[in-house]
Amino acid sequence: MSLHLQVLNQVFDLQQKINAGKDAASCERNFRRLFSLFEDEGYIIQNPLHEVYSDSRTDCEASVIGSPAARMKICSVLKPIIYQKTAAQLQLVQKAVVMVEKI
């Protein structure tokens, strides 16, 4: 079965569970399968939630909540960091979009 069909089947199953009022725990298996499908295609998805943030990070684009400080942490992730494995190297294909706040 093609990757696209597998993804669409998982999305459809998630939609059915949400429409039936199922809780988030019942959807966890579908999310694991979706991530696994993309990992099998060479993508690495990283959630930087609660990591330390500094302006020198090249894998995140941040919006600051409150006033900037010397020590900041990631408090919300709108988009994850995504890498793709290509011929024994990792290539950043998407920077995370995050919200940061003073520690």
Which residue ranges define each predicted feature?
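Extended, amphipathic alpha-helical stalk segments that mediate dimerization
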Residues: 1-21, 29, 36-103
